[in-house]
A protein has these predicted regions:
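Catalytic alpha/beta core of large soluble enzyme barrels
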Residues: 1, 11-18, 28, 32-47, ...
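Internal maturation/activation junctions in enzymes
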Residues: 42-49, 67, 72-118
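A short, ordered amphipathic alpha-helix with a cationic face
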Residues: 57-59, 87-88
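Terminal amphipathic helices with adjacent charged low-complexity linkers/tails
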Residues: 61-65
Length: 207
């Protein structure tokens, strides 16, 4: 939990369907190094001193996984014990990497290293399931809002991208629609129950 006058320091691991424990460790290492380097950037010119003090004391990281449901190991499809073991290994590896690099950089070791966040925007940019959630369906329409005065939005309208005025702000905003096909054999919301999703959340919370 963040203190008052404290900010996140997030870095993201994109999980792919073919990732195994070794490739995940490599990604975790790089994301942790990046986060630890970001934790050195505490010269906040326009904020009160308490922001700098909190950032330096806790040196927080937020190494997150997105695309969990695209991977058999991390989605629990290979069994609960394998998932729990993998999460413990990855967490320990992130903590050890942070410890090593914090010492090299002359900063405090992070008081928190790992997290899981929804990652809605990142998942769209890299085409993966969002955070620890399944994809919606095999085929669906993704909508994206844009300002009617934005040059990119204007170009898209001129080039024939499907669009319509926004219901909420029809004079200033448009909504573009994109057809999306999810990867074959991915987990979609109709293939996992609410209880199974909560069990997965619990595993990530505990490990």
């Amino acid at each position: 939990v963040l203190r008052p006058s404290q900010m996140c320091n997030l870095s993201e691991v994109v999980v792919r369907s073919d990732d195994d424990i070794n490739s995940l460790k490599r990604k975790i290492r790089l994301a942790t190094i990046l986060g630890t380097m970001q934790a050195t950037l505490t010269n906040f010119h326009y904020l009160r001193d308490i922001w700098k003090q909190n950032a330096e004391e806790e040196a927080l990281l937020g190494v997150s996984l997105t695309g969990v449901m695209d991977n058999k190991l991390l989605s629990g499809q290979e069994g609960k014990s394998k998932l729990n073991d993998a999460l413990e290994q990855l967490k320990a590896y992130a903590i050890e990497t942070n410890k090593t690099w914090a010492k090299k950089l002359g900063i405090n070791q992070a008081t928190a290293v790992t997290t899981i966040k929804p990652s809605g925007t990142v998942s769209q940019l890299v085409d993966c399931a969002s955070g620890m959630h399944p994809r919606w369906s095999q085929y669906y329409i993704r909508t994206v809002r844009g300002s009617i005065n934005d040059p990119v939005a204007k170009m898209m309208m001129e080039r024939g991208f499907p669009w319509e005025p926004s219901v909420m702000k029809p004079d200033v905003e448009v909504v573009f629609s994109f057809p999306v096909k999810a990867p074959d054999n991915c987990i979609t919301v109709d293939r996992i129950s609410a209880i199974e999703q909560l069990e997965l959340w619990k595993a990530y919370k505990e490990h």
